[in-house]
């Protein structure tokens, strides 16, 4: 009966976290284990652990203030007198009390999985696990108890559990913002355990670094669970360490040194670690060269490899040894910052085309690194481009092929200063192959230009390429050099005007002018001038400018105009006449028309005939021209006279089948002129009566010429 009452009181005080009263029962339950089990299970999980510090002193028996022993009955009476609410629970009938007693015992035993707690250490471990089930985010909740425990109260096994399980788990939960319970963590398979520890390590930001994860999570976990070899086999491999990022590389390095320290007394595990390092570098070294501080990383890796026995091999490929890896690393440091260990070995065995592809790839990548061109070129001059040495890597590529490849890459990068320096260094002036390469890129830049202005980036590149040709390839270029120079000049001049030469697939024009459009007009260069006159309304008055442009187009496109200069000029002037009429400028059209007839007449009958056959319609339109701005839409008298003059000249050269229509228009004008009152001519341009004799005289002369014709 007393045993049951004391047990129930202990359960009540434990559930109330009543430190003062529970301490009075520490030696009253028959065994210390019962007392510890009650406190372990029933003490509120959320209560401050400091309230349980008294358990560290369980070895000392609780004495009465006077030092006299008290009986169990006295303790029960004292406790009930201090709290009368306990009486119904404790002084109930025997059956009820006994049932409560057994039910509580069964509950506590089940909660502890039938474990018996013999001492403070066992109690503390189970208490930590029980509280962790309710408060899993704080596995170190009871740290105050183990940190303040007296020496030798807690075993090294328990301390190892704290250091190898609780502390790493607490660190991981905080880092990942996850909650793993202690029981869950301890039962987790190794592969999943390793994966969780390294989850997000490569993306970490803030105060926690890679070293913290290794030092505070991984190393204690591996050491406590004796999982070093398992980790090396299952996790420290080429799949996990691609070396594609600086973080992955740093993780690889820091982890290696941690593992090396962990297995230093285990030769088999140490050799396995070294083999895995060689395997990782052999398969993933190509990714190193995308990382920052490459020189430092190569030195770091060389330091690691140099400490390996030469005979260390890769399990999957026994022919690759640590000795070969050291030799490859030496080549890396001196010559290359691109190829992987596997590729270096393969390159030496490949044919010419494959070696050239690798060489070009190497140069392209190195040249594209900021501020690396000059230093890399110097390194190349000292190694694979040193004419005094044999190239031991790219053994099947000639010097010309190497330089051609380098120049092509530099042209793509627009590094013209380096291009010129290489041509001068290796005396490649007027080299046919290099000249053809330069011309190829001239056209590449020219065709990609968005406009023809010299300041346009692609046009500037084309100009710089041409300058190199002018300086170093003039003999090889010959007359082609002048044509390219003129083409750039014409492109620049055309771009200062409104112009649209870009033809779409359906024949319509797009909006933008590109210099390459000029090349589409080789068979019809005059169409370019026509487009200019159409889009630049004032240009029809500037014949010298369009003439210069047209002849420049002929020269740049290598169009032969020998013996055709006069006809080309006449065609251009007639085009100007058309656009003068479009712009309602009869005066300019008339003056140009007179010049055309004079030029053709001086050139001979064949030019006159060609003029009539090809351009009679333009002059006929002059004879029919009406300016809507004229008074009453009537042709001024002076203009009628000039139109009759032009039509009279046209009758001399127009095709026979067109004579009737030209004569008809001339007659219409003559009839209109005869109907004018030349004394009071309100349609005269100057409104003066003395025009009568002048206009009449010209009219009679024209009439006489037509009659004779």
From Swiss-Prot:
Its main location: endoplasmic reticulum. It is found in: Endoplasmic reticulum membrane. One of its GO terms (biological process) is protein transport. Pfam families: Sec39. Keywords: Endoplasmic reticulum, ER-Golgi transport, Membrane, Protein transport, Transport. It is a peripheral membrane protein. One of its GO terms (cellular component) is nuclear envelope. The keyword Nucleotide-binding does not apply. Required for protein transport between the Golgi and the endoplasmic reticulum. May contribute to tethering of coatomer-coated retrograde transport vesicles to the ER membrane through interaction with and stabilization of the SNARE complex. Belongs to the SEC39 family. PANTHER family: PROTEIN TRANSPORT PROTEIN SEC39 (PTHR40787:SF3), SECRETED PROTEIN (PTHR40787). Component of a peripheral membrane protein complex consisting of DSL1, SEC39/DSL3 and TIP20. Bound to a SNARE complex consisting of UFE1, USE1, SEC20 and SEC22 or YKT6 through direct interaction of TIP20 with SEC20. Interacts with TIP20 and DSL1. Cells with a reduced level of SEC39 show a defect in post-translational processing of PRC1/CPY. This is Protein transport protein SEC39. It comes from Saccharomyces cerevisiae (strain ATCC 204508 / S288c) (Baker's yeast). The gene is SEC39.
């Amino acid at each position: 009966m007393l045993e049951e009452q004391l047990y129930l009181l202990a359960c009540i005080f434990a559930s109330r976290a009543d430190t003062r009263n529970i301490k009075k029962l520490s030696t009253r339950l028959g065994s210390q284990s019962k007392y510890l089990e009650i406190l372990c299970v029933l003490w509120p999980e959320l209560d401050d652990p400091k309230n349980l510090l008294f358990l560290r002193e369980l070895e000392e028996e609780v004495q009465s203030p006077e030092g006299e022993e008290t009986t169990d009955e006295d303790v029960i009476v004292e406790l009930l007198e201090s709290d009368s609410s306990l009486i119904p629970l404790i002084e109930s009938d025997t059956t009820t009390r006994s049932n409560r007693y057994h039910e509580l015992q069964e509950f506590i035993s089940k909660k502890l999985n039938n474990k018996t707690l013999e001492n403070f250490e066992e109690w503390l471990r189970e208490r930590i696990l029980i509280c962790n089930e309710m408060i899993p985010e704080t596995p170190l909740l009871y740290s105050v108890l183990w940190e303040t425990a007296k020496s030798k109260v807690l075993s090294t096994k328990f301390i190892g559990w704290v250091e190898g399980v609780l502390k790493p788990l607490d660190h991981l939960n905080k880092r990942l913002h996850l909650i793993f319970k202690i029981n869950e963590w301890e039962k987790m398979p190794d592969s999943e355990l390793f994966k969780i520890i390294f989850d997000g390590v490569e993306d970490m930001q803030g105060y926690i670094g890679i070293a913290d994860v290794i030092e505070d999570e991984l190393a204690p976990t591996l050491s406590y669970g004796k999982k070093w070899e398992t980790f090396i086999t299952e996790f420290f491999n080429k799949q996990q360490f691609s070396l594609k990022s600086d973080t992955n590389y740093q993780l690889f390095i820091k982890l290696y040194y941690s593992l090396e320290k962990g297995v230093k007394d285990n030769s088999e595990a140490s050799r396995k670690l070294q083999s895995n390092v060689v395997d990782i570098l052999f398969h993933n070294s190509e990714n190193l060269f995308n990382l920052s501080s490459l020189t430092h990383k190569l030195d770091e890796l060389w330091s690691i490899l140099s400490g390996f026995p030469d005979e260390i091999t890769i399990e999957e490929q026994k022919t690759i040894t640590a000795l070969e890896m050291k030799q490859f690393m030496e080549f890396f440091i001196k010559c290359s910052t691109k190829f992987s260990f596997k590729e270096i070995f393969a390159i030496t065995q490949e044919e010419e085309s494959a070696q050239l592809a690798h060489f070009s790839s190497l140069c392209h990548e190195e040249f594209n690194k900021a501020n690396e061109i000059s230093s890399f070129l110097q390194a190349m001059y000292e190694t694979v481009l040193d004419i005094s040495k044999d190239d031991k890597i790219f053994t099947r590529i000639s010097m010309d092929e190497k330089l051609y490849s380098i120049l092509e890459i530099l042209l793509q990068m627009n590094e013209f200063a380096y291009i010129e320096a290489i041509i001068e260094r290796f005396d490649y002036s007027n080299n046919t192959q290099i000249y053809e390469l330069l011309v190829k890129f001239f056209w590449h830049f020219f065709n990609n230009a968005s406009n023809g202005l010299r300041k346009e980036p692609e046009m500037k590149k084309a100009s710089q390429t041409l300058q190199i040709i002018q300086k170093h390839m003039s003999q090889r270029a010959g007359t082609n050099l002048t044509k390219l120079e003129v083409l750039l000049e014409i492109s620049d001049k055309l771009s200062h005007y409104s112009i649209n030469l870009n033809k779409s697939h359906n024949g319509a024009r797009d909006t933008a002018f590109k210099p390459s459009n000029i090349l589409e007009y080789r068979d019809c260069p005059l169409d370019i001038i026509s487009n200019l006159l159409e889009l630049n309304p004032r240009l029809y008055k500037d014949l010298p400018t369009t003439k210069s442009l047209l002849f420049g187009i002929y020269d740049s496109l290598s169009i032969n105009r020998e013996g055709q200069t006069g006809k080309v000029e006449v065609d251009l002037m007639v085009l100007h006449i058309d656009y003068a009429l479009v712009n309602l400028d009869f005066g300019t059209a008339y003056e140009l028309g007179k010049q055309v007839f004079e030029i053709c007449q001086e050139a001979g009958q064949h030019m006159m005939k060609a003029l009539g056959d090809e351009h009679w319609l333009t002059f006929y339109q002059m004879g029919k021209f009406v300016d809507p701005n004229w008074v009453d839409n009537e042709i001024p008298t002076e203009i009628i006279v000039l139109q009759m003059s032009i039509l009279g000249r046209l009758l001399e050269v127009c095709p026979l089948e067109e004579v009737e229509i030209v004569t008809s228009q001339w007659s219409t004008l003559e009839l209109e002129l005869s109907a004018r009152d030349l004394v009071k001519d309100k349609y005269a341009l100057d409104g003066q009566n003395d025009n009568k004799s002048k206009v009449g005289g010209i009219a009679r002369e024209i009439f006489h010429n037509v009659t004779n014709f």
